[in-house]
Regions:
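Short loop/turn and low-complexity linker motifs enriched in small/turn-promoting residues
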Residues: 1-73
């Protein structure tokens, strides 16, 4: 099992490989090792639109971390 945290200013759904699920930003996500394309649920008010990652060799205490930045309004 691998661990990922997707940071964003707001709580938002996280889309993994184009599949929405029960994942949320700012929480630890548990996924199998592998390559993933991470996006946020709408609205599209952030950059980048998608982040590709290779998830391997993580622990719950040292998860892979990515950040989406909210666009200026």
């Amino acid at each position: 099992m691998e661990y990922l945290v997707v940071y964003f200013d707001d709580d938002r759904g996280v889309i993994v490989n184009s599949a929405p699920g029960a994942w949320m930003t700012n929480q630890i996500l548990m996924l199998e090792a592998g390559t993933y394309y991470i996006e946020l649920a709408p609205p599209a008010d952030h950059t980048p639109p998608q982040i590709p990652i290779q998830l391997v060799d993580t622990t719950v205490d040292d998860p892979y971390e990515i950040n989406f930045i909210k666009n200026a309004s």
